[in-house]
């Protein structure tokens, strides 16, 4: 997983509340067994509309999504996070996230930054005035900067640490590789073992 410290990118305003995982990526797109290639399913129902925000020229390369409250509700679907990331998003800003979505995001490398709704609405207003404007998200300082405006955001310390270190679940496990090998070397030979990668 790539380390996350600071990200600057075009921000897309998604002025909708209660965006659930089925709207983020419909179930019909969940049939593949890999973790990549889901970008075509992202907001598939809405992207058919030429007026949808991600179909507008200033936002086609957006990497920061500024969403309404209750983003990522619905079924537990890692594919929702993967679709956002495959499309190019590194950050989602919202005033409220579904807990499972927020957890899946941090584990996959997507920053789900929780902000005050009044700040989200001001960012929407600023983006309406400057379509295609870039936002800088600083995870170390927990700030979002758009032009002369700086806002704070919340993310729990553990998720922040994982993102800044670039640690997914496998990366976390590999930090203990020596201890795992030491344990395996002392384990009785008749018990199951992990086989070293060749």
Curated annotation (Swiss-Prot):
Catalyzes the isomerization between 2-isopropylmalate and 3-isopropylmalate, via the formation of 2-isopropylmaleate. This is 3-isopropylmalate dehydratase small subunit. NCBIfam families: leuD (TIGR00171), PRK01641.1 (NF002458). It comes from Corynebacterium jeikeium (strain K411). Belongs to the LeuD family. LeuD type 1 subfamily. GO terms for cellular component: 3-isopropylmalate dehydratase complex. It is an enzyme of class 4 (lyase). Its EC number is 4.2.1.33.
């Amino acid at each position: 997983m790539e380390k996350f410290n600071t990200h600057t990118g075009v921000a897309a305003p998604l002025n909708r509340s209660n965006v659930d995982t089925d709207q983020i990526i419909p179930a019909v797109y969940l049939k593949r067994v890999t973790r990549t290639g889901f970008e075509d399913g992202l907001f598939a129902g809405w992207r058919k509309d030429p007026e949808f925000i991600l179909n507008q020229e200033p936002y086609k390369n957006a990497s920061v999504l500024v969403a309404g409250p209750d983003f990522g509700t619905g079924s537990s679907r890692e594919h929702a996070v993967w679709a956002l990331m495959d499309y190019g998003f590194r950050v989602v800003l919202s005033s409220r996230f579904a807990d499972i979505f927020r957890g899946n995001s941090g584990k996959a490398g997507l920053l789900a930054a929780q902000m005050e709704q009044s700040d989200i609405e001001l960012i929407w207003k600023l983006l309406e005035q400057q379509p295609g404007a870039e936002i800088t998200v600083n995870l170390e300082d927990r700030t979002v900067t758009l032009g002369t405006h700086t806002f704070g955001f919340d993310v729990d310390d553990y998720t922040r640490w994982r993102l800044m270190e670039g640690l997914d679940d496998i990366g976390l496990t590999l930090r203990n590789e020596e201890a795992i090998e030491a344990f395996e070397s002392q384990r009785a030979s008749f018990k199951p073992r992990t086989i070293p990668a060749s």
